[in-house]
Amino acid sequence: MINEILDKVGRLLEEVRTKKPLVHSITNYITATDCANVILAVGGSPTMADYVKEVEEIASISSAVVLNMGVISEKMVEAMILAGKSANKNNVPVIFDPVGAGVANFRNKSAEKILSEVKVDIIRGNISEIKFICGLRSETKGVDASERDMNMGNDKKVIVAQELAKKLNCVVAITGVDDIISDGKRNVILSNGHKMLANVTGTGCMSSALCGAFAGASDDYFIAAICAVLTMSISGEIAYEKSKGIGMGTFHISLIDAISMMNENVIKEKARVTTINR
């Protein structure tokens, strides 16, 4: 099964460059540039429109829509719901990044409102965010996962991901030291990445943007999520080797470089994937 997954991931890396999916990303001003750049780096075409009077139209012609709660407001929630509903109506996949879910009442209610009105196809977040969405007690530390949640065993994280995937009929990606991805039936643990990724603002948001790019070129959103997370985590390893002893700025640039150069051979050489039957 692992070889089959990696074959599909490798093909998708090529297909996204051929199809050049238009990815409508309603995201936050902190990470918007990096999100746009990683979409471009893998071959997609980003649009970052968030004005309520145009989001429905843009979503309707897009290949994927990414809704990111990094900086939230009533107008942003309205725009996300309008874009999400338009995407649903036009069979466009929706990726939801519930940044900071669990940390504050308005943010929590916003996440709940979006999910009550929009059918999402991929949810990507850290373990604390995903636990909150799943209705479990979480201990979010700002927009970061709490240490207690991060120290949950992978077996428990797989259960959380799988149950939420079944509940919402979507793919769930929990990113962290190890990454858990489930569509409710298929479950994988991805064990790539480097701790330096946590020191760059927005690598989670970038991972969600990559989910949009790959989902926009595939109808298998489980594979799209795996492709996105492996691309980010393996690129983190490569970027660390290139920037070792230099500093964070070089790591950041090297990360984008590595994402832009990702291909099937690199994935098959470096990916560490474990399938979980449950």
From Swiss-Prot:
Belongs to the Thz kinase family. Pathway: Cofactor biosynthesis; thiamine diphosphate biosynthesis; 4-methyl-5-(2-phosphoethyl)-thiazole from 5-(2-hydroxyethyl)-4-methylthiazole: step 1/1. It catalyses: 5-(2-hydroxyethyl)-4-methylthiazole + ATP = 4-methyl-5-(2-phosphooxyethyl)-thiazole + ADP + H(+). Keywords: ATP-binding, Kinase, Magnesium, Metal-binding, Nucleotide-binding, Thiamine biosynthesis, Transferase. Signal peptide: none annotated. Coiled coil: none annotated. It is an enzyme of class 2 (transferase). ATP binds at R124, T175. Its cofactor is Mg(2+). It comes from Clostridium botulinum (strain Alaska E43 / Type E3). Its EC number is 2.7.1.50. Substrate binds at M48, G202. This is Hydroxyethylthiazole kinase. GO terms for biological process: thiamine biosynthetic process; thiamine diphosphate biosynthetic process. NCBIfam families: PRK09355.1 (NF006830), thiM (TIGR00694). One of its GO terms (molecular function) is magnesium ion binding. Catalyzes the phosphorylation of the hydroxyl group of 4-methyl-5-beta-hydroxyethylthiazole (THZ).
